[in-house]
Every structure is written in structure tokens, then in C-alpha cells.
From Swiss-Prot:
The WSXWS motif appears to be necessary for proper protein folding and thereby efficient intracellular transport and cell-surface receptor binding. The keyword Transmembrane applies. The gene is IL12RB2. This is Interleukin-12 receptor subunit beta-2. One of its GO terms (biological process) is positive regulation of cell population proliferation. It comes from Bos taurus (Bovine).
Length: 861
């Protein structure tokens, strides 16, 4: 079967060769192209190229001539008429150049005759830097060399190795760019001291060159295989003793180790001899991830190092933390006896933590007495608690991992800004790039020597909603008056920066604001309320969102102008620190509608305007405009009322204008002292009452009622205070409810009708008939006869003004009295009727109804 496959392969090769020969014959069937001296020449040599036509291969008999053209690639270089052409060519470049000969029988068509390739190259250079290597004890010998310059020709390299006992190994490299070759033989360890010689020879069409012989022994060329199965062991789970283990080839005598932390770029190197796959490392750091690699060598001076082994990565065990926490605090008063203490601390570095920090222990205690007041364990880097304001307090914070705790950091809780003399001066913040700020200050003028250290504190001024900005701080010695801060610094964010000067248990502070980069704000403030307060306008607004402020805001501007006005708006510029979210304006005119809006400014420019709000100041009249007229009117009124005649008229007018519903009832004469002092005889009164009851009409047959109206003109005047008092006349005013026993009716008078209707067209004063003693009656005679008085008659002796009396019409003519022709007078008072002052009458002992007009609101004579 193998012979059959081999025969088929040979037949296929033979057929391909025949086809190639046939193709060549077919290509050059009209003529030949010859090259002298050779198709391969050295650089700078000349060559002769000839082209000739074969018999009967020229132009047709009708053609007048044969024209042969020689092309170098696609460019004509020579033309000749006839059956042959010959030309010498010089200056050919390195590499291969194609020449083609063509026949032209007419002006348009050219026929390809034949062509030739000429190769230009150089003689091979002597190979240099010949070296050989055998990888591992069971590897094969491989040699490498430097070829030198390119010959641009096909060059063959032959490697020949000569050993003891006339042993020779030879192998040729057919690659065009051959610079290494594997002999495929293994030199065994039994001949470690045997000497070997190797050389390489380069051959091409222009010549050959051989390298210098290279002699070596097995130890010189054998490169051990990299160590494998690397592992590490920590004795007692401690980093103090670490053992690195690996496996090697048997002939290895020397090892080198390198290791480094993962985040480091430099290696720690260790050389060990005859290690036998084991080495102890004593300088590893706790809780650190390391990378380990190992290399091997067979001899101290001969041979080469093996390649580095694959990396081993592992983390060392934890150890107790070292170092102390960097602690800072904030103090805030809540009320008169409580304060809030917020402690902050920074994480320990990996070299200080020496493990995973599980928690922090916080202790607060009073300085006096030293008793522990509060202890807490937290996993965060901050802690807040409320403690009393009494006494001096101190705090201690320590970090703990699985192996132990660090030393506590102790700090006294003092008023950081309580001492004004310790406050640093001229605190400034300047940008130092996209994420850095340089803070500078000057020491306090009067307490420079007392300052023990400075603390620079910063935090974002306007964090997002619901966010607590991280607090950053750093300590600075007293001789350093600047600090470069870069922790949590972002561009286009405003930071509040505070510098504290500490001296024992006292401190002073000063602050500023700064940003690393700034632009004009992206939006303006939003006005949320406009209110009027004491003639001025109070404008309140919402802060611009922190991400749209684009740096520290330096000023706010409030613009306003009248609505529908084309004039330039007025403005008020407010420094940021003075009014963070409200400001009054007192230059607006009352009852004018204004349009208001706001902008904000940073060091880079002004923001777009915020929302517009309309507002009209209602205003209040100036109190001075009312005070002067009021005083004038008061003076005039006092002057007018001081005159008696005007005062009387004014009071009469006021009494006349007083509504009826606000007046109180007139006292009932039936309840007077006179009625009780002179009682009516019971028998006659009873007879009179019986007669009245018998003559009283039934409701079915009402009798017509005739009412005589008595109109009396009166002239009211005020009585002077020197007139005799009411007591001198023996009269008084007293209000009582009229009982049936004190009331009498005339036998000839009809019973009292119902109250008059609205059809009468006027108000009527209703009265009852009053029983009275005659002029001859005496107080000691209770059986004196009943005297029926006229309707219009009222007794004046020890009598009272009537009230709540039914109207009783009179059928008798009014009794004339000489006093009726005299001017009628009445004494008025501004007091209510229930407290009327006693009146003095000039009517003698009798007062008739034609002299008296009584209403619910006045009493006139």
C-alpha cells in the first residue's frame, strides 16, 4: 500500500513538470531571450540581454518590417528592427528584475516573444553570535546565530556539531530567513565535561561564509527547566516564619527567588545554594498579598538560569494592628445643658492595620475623675452622641482585627473656635489643578507662640439631598502655614474650608470657601416667596442645586422693574455670606406691580436668570398723615364741647339718633314710694274694679276706642349744677314692675285696648290710670276714698315716672294749668334711662300729661 502511494506521488510530480515545460515552450515559441554572463549577478554588475526570432516567426510577408522591443517590467528600454536584439543593462537594484521582448508588426499590436528574470544579490556574510542551548536534562540541542545582512538570494545554512570520538551531527536549514536550527540530539549528563564544537555555514549562488567555531560542554549549554509545584507554608499561622517550597531537576545546584507585594513594581531578590526546594522568608508583611517566582541553575559559574517559574500569589496572615488612628471631632450645642459630639477618624493603612479591621472601639469619659461614661463599638469611621455640657470631656478611639487592637488615640473635647485670639488670619484657598486646593493662612497676631498645631478641615458646602458630605482634615505643625488638600476634592464643587489653631485645651478658627475649578452657574435661584414686612419686601429663594452651581457662589443679584416697562431693571447685589436665602428690599413703590427675578455669580460669571415673580406692594398710609388731622379735630371738638349750648345740642342730637332697641324701659310709677306710702282703700278699689270688669266689653263685641293725642312742644335745656337737687323736691326715679295692687282704673273709662297697630302711623306712649290721694289726704288715713285722676295727670309729690303701663284713653278734657304757658324745660343726661338723675320741676305739686312727653328713649317737658 505504501509503494502504491509513493508511485502515485511520483507520477503526479512528473505530469506537473511536463505541463510546466509545455507552458514554457508555448510562451517562447516565437523566439528566445538570453542573458550573459548569468541570470544571477552581484550588486553593481552589468548584464547583456539578447532577443532573437525563430525562423518563420516574424511578421507576415505583407509586412514591411519586424520591430523588436525590450521591456524592463512595463517600461521600454530598447527598440531594434530586424530578427534579433541585443542590449547591455547596468545598475540593476537588489532583488529580481523582469525583462520581456516583444514584436511589433503594426502600429497598434505587439506580440510577446519571450522574457527573462535577473536576480541581483550579495555574497552571504559570516554568521555571528553562534550559541547553543539544551532545555533541561532531556531536551535537544538548539543553536542560534545572527545571519548578517540580507543577501536577496536564496541562501542555505548548514549547522555542524562535532563531538568526542569523532562524532559529527549536521543539519541544513532551507528557510530563506534561517537564523536558528534544532539538531534534534540530546547530550546526556554522563558527558558533563566533554567538549563539543559547532559552526554554521551560509551558501548562495554568489558564494559562501562560515561562522567561527563555538566550543562548549554540557554544563555550558544546558538550561534547567523552571521549578514547579511552588507552595508556601506559614508556621503557627504567623508571618514571622514563612517557608517557600518547590520542586527542581536533580542537577540543580543554585536557585534564586524573587517576591513582591501585588501593588509594588520592584522585586525583592534572594539567591540560595543547594536549597533542595526549600527556603525560609522572614521579612514578609502581615495581611499582604505577595507574588513569588523561582529560577534554577546547574552550576555556580557555568551555564544559564532557567526561565522564571509560574507566579504564586498568596496573602500573609494577620497580625495585631500597629500605629494610631487619626481622629478629629465636631462639637455642637443642642440646648443649655446638652451638646452633640461627632467623632471622625481615618482608616489605618494596610501596613498599620495588618489585617481586616472588624470594628472600632470608642470611649467617652470625663477628664475629672476619669470614670468611663460611655463605650461603643462601631464598624463605621464616625460616631455621634449627645453628652452633658458640664465638665471637661475626652475621647479615645482604637481599631481591632482578629488578632488584637491598636493603641487608642486620645483627644480632649474643647471649644475649637472659642478663643478669638487664636483665630488664624487671612485664610485663602487657591486652585492647584482639577483635584487639589492650596490653603494658606497667617498665624494669629497676638498668640503666635502659643499655637501648638494647626488643623485644616474641609467638606462639601452643598451636598445632595439626604447626603452627609465626607469630612476631610489634616494636621500641620505650627511652623507650616499652608496645606495642599486633595482628598475628596472634585472640580466645580464648592468646599467650606476651616483652619483651627490649637493651644492646649483652647482653640481658634477661621474659614473660607474654595473650588478647584469653576464656571458660571447653569441656572439661577428660584424665588419661592415674596412677602411684605413693615413697608419693605422680603424675598426668599431656593438654593441652586449643588451640581448646577459649578463652583462657589460669590454674590446674588435681585432684579426688578415695573411690569410692561421697557426701562432697564434695577438690581441689588447681595454678598453670599450675608443672606443665604432671603433678603429685604425697601425701594419698591406701593401699589405698583413689579416683575422680579434673580441670578447668581461665581468667579467665572453670572448665571441665567431664574424664575420671574410679580408682586405689588400694598403699603400702609403714613401714620403721620392721620396724627395731625386727628389732633386738630380733637382740639376743635374740645373747644366746641366746652361751650354749654353746643354741648346740649350735641347730646340731644346723639340721644335722638340713638335707636329705640338700645334704650331701657322707663321706671313704673306703680312701684314708686308714693304708691306704697298712700295705699288705695281696698273696698273702693274692689268696687271700682268690679264695675270695670262688668262693663268690660267681650272680645266678640269690641267697643270703638277714641284716642286723643296731645302734642306738646318742648324746649330742652340743661339745668345748671347749682339748682336744687331732686331730694329737695322730695322726688326720685326708680324702675319697678307695676303690680295689679298698685294700679287703679277710672269707673268712667273703658278698659285698656290692645296695643295699637302699625296703621296708626305713629308711636303712642301707653299709660295706666294712677290711683292717688287727694290734696287733703293724709298719710295716716288708709281708708280715704279713691281719687280718679285724669288720664293726663301725674302726681309730682313722691312720684316716679311711669313705665310698662298700658295705654288708657281719656274722655275728659285736659285740665289746663297756668304753667302750660311757661317755657318747658327738661334736664338731660348722657347716662342711660335706668340711671336718670333727679329732675327738678317748676310745675308745683301737680304734673299733667300735657306737660310731659315720655318715650322709650327720652324724657321731655
Amino acid at each position: 500500500m505504501a509503494h502504491t502511494v509513493g508511485g502515485c506521488s511520483l507520477a503526479l510530480i512528473f505530469i506537473i513538470m511536463l505541463l510546466l515545460v509545455k507552458a514554457k515552450i508555448d510562451v517562447c515559441k516565437r523566439g528566445d531571450v538570453t542573458v550573459q554572463p548569468s541570470h544571477v549577478i552581484s550588486l553593481g554588475s552589468a548584464v547583456n540581454i539578447s532577443c532573437s526570432l525563430k525562423p518563420k516567426q516574424g511578421c507576415l510577408p505583407s509586412s514591411s518590417f519586424n520591430k523588436l522591443i525590450l521591456y524592463k517590467f512595463d517600461r521600454r528600454i530598447y527598440v531594434q528592427h530586424g530578427h534579433s536584439l541585443s542590449s547591455q543593462v547596468k545598475g540593476l537594484p537588489l532583488g529580481t528584475t523582469l525583462f520581456v521582448c516583444k514584436l511589433a508588426c503594426s502600429s497598434s499590436d505587439e506580440i510577446r516573444i519571450c522574457g527573462a528574470e535577473i536576480s541581483v544579490g550579495v555574497v552571504p556574510e559570516q554568521p555571528r553570535n553562534l550559541s547553543c542551548i539544551q532545555k533541561g536534562e532531556r531536551g535537544t540541542v538548539t543553536c542560534t546565530w545572527h545571519r548578517g545582512r540580507d543577501t536577496h538570494l536564496y541562501t542555505a545554512y548548514t549547522l555542524q556539531l562535532n563531538g568526542p570520538k569523532n562524532l559529527t551531527w549536521q543539519k541544513q536549514c532551507n528557510d530563506h530567513y534561517c537564523d536558528h536550527l534544532d539538531l534534534g540530539i540530546n547530550l546526556t549528563p554522563e558527558s558533563l565535561e566533554s567538549s563539543y564544537t559547532v559552526k554554521v555555514t551560509a551558501i548562495n549562488s554568489l558564494g559562501s561564509a562560515s561562522s567561527f567555531p563555538f566550543s562548549f560542554t554540557l554544563l555550558d549549554i544546558v538550561r534547567p527547566l523552571p521549578p514547579w509545584d511552588i507552595r508556601i507554608k506559614f508556621v503557627n499561622a504567623s508571618v514571622d516564619r514563612c517557608t517557600l517550597l518547590w520542586r527542581d531537576e536533580g542537577l540543580v545546584l543554585l536557585n534564586r527567588l524573587r517576591y513582591r507585594p501585588i501593588n509594588s513594581r520592584s522585586w525583592n531578590m534572594v539567591n540560595v545554594t543547594n536549597a533542595k526546594g526549600r527556603h525560609d522568608l522572614l521579612d514578609l508583611k502581615p495581611f499582604t498579598e505577595y507574588e513569588f517566582q523561582i529560577s534554577s541553575k546547574l552550576h555556580l559559574y557555568k551555564g544559564s538560569w532557567s526561565d522564571w517559574s509560574e507566579s504564586l500569589r498568596t496573602q500573609t496572615p494577620e497580625e495585631e494592628p500597629i500605629g494610631m488612628l487619626n481622629v478629629w471631632y465636631m462639637r455642637q450645642h443642642i440646648d443649655y445643658n446638652r451638646q452633640q459630639i461627632s467623632l471622625f477618624w481615618k482608616n489605618l493603612s494596610l501596613s498599620e492595620a495588618r489585617g481586616k479591621i472588624l470594628h472600632y472601639q470608642v470611649t467617652l469619659q470625663k477628664v475629672a475623675g476619669g470614670e468611663i461614661t460611655l463605650q461603643n463599638i462601631t464598624e463605621h469611621t464616625s460616631w455621634t452622641w449627645v453628652i452633658p455640657r458640664t465638665g471637661n470631656w475626652a475621647a479615645a478611639v482604637s481599631a481591632a482585627n482578629s488578632k488584637g487592637s491598636s493603641l487608642p488615640t486620645r483627644i480632649n473635647i474643647t471649644d475649637l473656635c472659642g478663643a478669638e485670639l487664636l483665630a488664624p488670619q487671612q485664610v485663602l484657598a487657591k486652585s492647584e489643578g482639577m483635584d487639589k486646593l492650596m490653603v494658606t493662612w497667617t498665624p494669629p497676631e497676638k498668640a503666635t507662640a502659643a499655637v501648638q498645631e494647626y488643623v485644616v478641615e474641609w467638606r462639601e458646602l452643598h451636598p445632595g439631598a439626604g447626603m452627609q458630605p465626607p469630612l476631610g482634615w489634616l494636621w500641620s505643625p505650627p511652623y507650616r502655614l499652608s496645606a495642599l488638600i486633595s482628598e475628596n476634592i472634585k472640580p466645580y464643587i464648592c468646599y467650606e474650608i476651616r483652619v483651627h489653631a490649637l493651644a492646649g485645651d483652647q482653640g481658634g478658627c477661621n474659614s473660607t470657601r474654595g473650588n478647584s475649578q469653576h464656571k458660571a452657574p447653569l441656572s439661577g435661584p428660584h424665588i419661592n416667596a415674596i412677602s411684605e414686612e413693615k413697608g419693605s419686601v422680603l424675598i426668599s429663594w431656593d438654593e441652586i442645586p449643588a451640581r448646577e452651581q459649578m463652583g462657589c457662589i460669590l454674590h446674588y443679584r435681585i432684579y426688578w422693574k415695573e411690569r410692561d416697562s421697557n426701562s432697564q431693571p434695577q438690581l441689588c447685589e447681595i454678598p453670599y455670606r450675608i443672606s443665604p436665602n432671603s433678603h429685604p428690599i425697601d425701594s419698591l413703590q406701593p401699589r405698583v406691580t413689579y416683575v422680579l427675578w434673580m441670578t447668581a455669580l461665581t468667579a467665572a460669571g453670572e448665571s441665567p436668570q431664574g424664575n420671574e415673580r410679580e408682586f405689588c406692594l400694598q403699603g400702609k398710609a403714613n401714620w403721620s398723615t392721620f396724627v395731625a388731622p386727628s389732633i386738630c379735630m380733637a382740639v376743635i371738638m374740645v373747644g366746641v364741647l366746652s361751650m354749654r349750648c353746643f354741648r346740649q345740642k350735641v347730646f340731644v342730637l346723639l340721644l335722638a339718633l340713638r335707636p329705640q332697641w338700645c334704650s331701657k324701659e322707663i321706671p313704673d310709677p306703680a312701684n314708686s314710694t308714693w304708691a306704697k306710702k298712700y295705699p288705695i282703700v281696698e273696698e273702693k278699689t274692689q268696687l271700682a274694679l268690679d264695675r270695670l270688669l262688668t262693663e268690660w266689653p267681650t272680645p266678640e263685641e269690641p267697643e270703638p276706642l277714641v284716642i286723643n293725642e296731645v302734642l306738646c312742644r318742648v324746649t330742652p335745656v340743661f339745668r345748671p349744677p347749682h339748682h336744687r337737687s331732686w331730694s329737695e323736691k322730695g322726688q326720685g326715679v326708680q324702675g319697678h314692675y307695676t303690680s295689679e295692687e298698685d294700679t287703679g282704673y277710672s269707673a268712667s273709662s273703658p278698659p285698656p285696648p290692645r296695643a295699637p297697630t302699625a296703621e296708626t302711623g305713629q308711636g303712642v306712649d301707653l299709660y295706666k290710670v294712677l290711683g292717688s290721694k287727694g290734696p287733703d289726704s293724709k298719710p295716716g288715713n288708709p281708708a280715704s276714698p279713691l281719687t280718679i285722676l285724669p288720664v293726663d295727670y301725674l302726681p309730682t309729690h313722691d312720684g316716679y315716672l311711669p313705665s310698662n303701663m298700658d295705654y288708657l284713653p281719656s274722655h275728659e278734657a285736659p285740665i289746663t294749668d297756668p304753667l302750660e304757658e311757661l317755657p318747658q324745660h327738661i334736664s338731660l343726661s348722657i347716662f342711660p334711662s335706668s340711671s336718670l338723675r333727679p329732675l327738678t320741676f317748676s310745675c308745683g305739686e301737680k304734673l299733667t300729661l300735657d306737660q310731659l312727653k315720655m318715650g322709650c328713649g327720652s324724657l321731655m317737658l
